[in-house]
Amino acid sequence: MSKVIGIDLGTTNSAVAVLEGKEPKIITNPEGARTTPSVVAFKDGEIQVGEVAKRQAITNPNTIVSIKRHMGESDYKVKVGDKAYTPQEISAMILQYIKKFSEDYLGEPVTDAVITVPAYFNDAQRQATKDAGKIAGLNVQRIINEPTASALAYGLDKDEDDETVLVYDLGGGTFDVSVLQLGDGVFQVLSTNGDTHLGGDDFDNKIIDWLVDGFKQENGIDLSKDKMAMQRLKDAAEKAKKDLSGVSSTHISLPFISAGEAGPLHLEVDLTRAKFNELTDDLVQRTKIPFDNALRDAGLSVGDIDKVILNGGSTRIPAVQEAVKQWAGKEPDHSINPDEAVALGAAIQGGVISGDVKDIVLLDVTPLSLGIETKGGVFTKLIDRNTTIPTSKSQIFSTAVDNQPAVDIHVLQGERPMAADNKTLGRFELTDIPAAPRGVPQIQVTFDIDKNGIVNVSAKDLGTGKEQKITIQSASGLSDEEIERMKKEAEEHAEEDAKKKEEVDLRNEVDGLIFQTEKTLKEVDGKLADSDIQPVKDALEDLKKAQKDNNLDEMKEKKDALSKVAQDLAVKLYQQNSQNQQGQGGQAGPTDDGSNGANGDTVDGDFTKVDPDK
């Protein structure tokens, strides 16, 4: 097998590495740099990538930066002239450039790659990344999470006992925290959390806003309306941010930034580290919530963490390092280069795939729960978040009405108990179900998440063997804001969600009890005295009335009343059957009055009835 390169496809910068012997090595670009700006420019019909594209961004409006922030957004396009490009196409141009100079370095064609993504990337974003690789002519052997890759780079040569490692990964546009267990060549992810819209770009923007406000107050001119001025400000802000990682104050000088009535205007200002920390403190504090959540989901406290690894260029910011040190109660490990660790780890995984690296097992997790909508609009989870992947889970569901010929499988991703509060990943239909009473057909729904975190769902009618499958497409994924909203709302609305769930459960129980009671009344007709049957009929009508009036308190009261008299009826029927069969062996035990005739694990499905005549 040919070399498998490892690519860190970053928001602001990308890197590539390859395994040489037993060691991963960064491949430098044609300019000799170890990282490449994730910038694409269109100029005179030519596509420029990397440093050359970044250098002329001030004068060329057809320059695209930070495209990674839009991966997985089906409606996002970049217009250049009369053509519109998807984020996958722009990302593919960066990957093509990396592929080319990697081939020049290796002296052989490169076809296979491992590409990294933020741990909190959803299914749509992962699919989009894989698609970008395909467009670039790469066979993407594996998609792995960035914190996991950096842990691979950190732990490759470690011979110590088991370690619990927390990876704090703050890049140019995304943020992740992962907790891993390392030992005996096994890299097991225990939990992951993050914010796919937080990174170094946001720190730059804080400086830009400060410069714009200051210039406006002093000169009465709003630089934010001048595209060329804003590009100069962005370059200056990025440089100032980097300078302040090493010095306590930096001077920002932008001559001829604008012009007023008196002539040219210049921007000259000093930015201290203290002021920068003040401007960006809210961004640093935003990383605390995922930090805490990752520990909580792993079932650990800070005292259980043996090492803290910083990854991503933005972790060079002193305030970030100090915050992590304070939260973790220990000095972060600085043994790996935060700009290069992810690519090095991806190259190690490439070596595992090619067979050059032995005795390493990578066990990653899925960041969000997956399931389907069931009766009453409930979100029934099949795979919980932070489940080790690859994984597969099946559950039996059934029909909601008699003689239902088809079921609609509504696939969802999120953490809320009600389907409407989660994100639709896709829908598909299983048809030609033979006519049968509700609850009888056995529909097996299977979720499968592959090693790349990409989701496949199938539904199979166990009676006929007919099966329908769907691979969730990138257009149906979640946005980063939606992921954060799901997690936040799941905590804020826990009480409200519990009440909704309780109401739906009650309605489902009432519906099921009415159905079962009517079935029982047909079975006992003529077998018991009317005086035994009438109380059940009366209680049944009372419950139906409460159901029709939508009175929840009445429904609960009448449900309990019907359950009691129905149980009494079942006892009398059992006693009569016993008397009729005295002396006969092999008497069967009583049936579960709540059974619907299907598997005990069967869950009523919220499926759409399909008219076969249409």
Curated annotation (Swiss-Prot):
GO molecular function: ATP binding; ATP-dependent protein folding chaperone; unfolded protein binding
Modified residues (Phosphothreonine): T174
Transmembrane segments: none
Disulfide linkage: none
Residue segments, region Disordered: 573-614
Induction notes from the record: By stress conditions e.g. heat shock.
Keywords: ATP-binding, Chaperone, Nucleotide-binding, Phosphoprotein, Stress response
InterPro entries: ATPase_NBD, Chaperone_DnaK, Heat_shock_70_CS, HSP70_C_sf, HSP70_peptide-bd_sf, Hsp_70_fam
Matching CDD domains: ASKHA_NBD_HSP70_DnaK-like
Its job: Acts as a chaperone.
NCBIfam families linked: PRK00290.1 (NF001413), prok_dnaK (TIGR02350)
Family: Belongs to the heat shock protein 70 family.
Name of this protein: Chaperone protein DnaK
Species this protein is from: Lactobacillus delbrueckii subsp. bulgaricus (strain ATCC 11842 / DSM 20081 / BCRC 10696 / JCM 1002 / NBRC 13953 / NCIMB 11778 / NCTC 12712 / WDCM 00102 / Lb 14)
